[in-house]
């Protein structure tokens, strides 16, 4: 928000391109953020956005699990209240941290569990793709020096990322 970005959830990756085209059509700068896409889908989205930020995993949960240190996953697993159905499935969630945390994130999708996980990470535990994407967005949205009155207008579509 401080960068002048408006976040819009397209609802699914297939709707990112059409929604981006709508906002570009009214003169907005559009950044697209999404999960790994096939070549055709990625190309279609890229044509409609000013810059595409696509991570290398099929889902955001996969990004967190594959690109966060195991210690961060264990730390978070010890902090959360496990739902009863997952306690039954994973009596010792730490013994299979990848599977248990995937199940947890999947069961809490849309409830802020991924953001909650990231909020307890130190900077070194946050996946590099997230840090690099944030750096690029910040750099792209910095007001031009000498033009303090400039307003940055950008739309970010995060699709199913968060």
Enumerate the language-model features and the residues they cover.
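Acidic, Mg2+-coordinating catalytic modules of nucleic-acid enzymes
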Residues: 1-162
């Amino acid at each position: 928000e401080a960068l002048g970005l408006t976040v819009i959830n397209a609802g699914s990756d297939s709707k990112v391109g059409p929604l981006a085209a709508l906002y570009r059509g009214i003169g907005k700068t559009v950044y697209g953020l999404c999960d790994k896409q096939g070549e055709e889908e990625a190309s279609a989205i890229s044509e409609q956005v000013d810059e595409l930020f696509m991570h290398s995993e099929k889902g955001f949960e996969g990004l967190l699990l594959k690109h966060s240190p195991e210690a961060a996953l264990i730390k978070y697993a010890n902090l959360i209240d496990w739902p009863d159905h997952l306690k039954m499935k994973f009596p010792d969630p730490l013994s299979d941290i990848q599977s248990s945390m995937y199940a947890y994130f999947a069961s809490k999708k849309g409830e802020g569990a991924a953001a909650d996980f990231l909020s307890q990470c130190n900077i070194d535990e946050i996946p590099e793709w997230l840090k690099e994407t944030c750096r690029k967005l910040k750099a792209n949205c910095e007001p031009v020096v000498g033009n303090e009155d400039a307003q940055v207008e950008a739309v970010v579509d995060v699709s199913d990322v968060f």
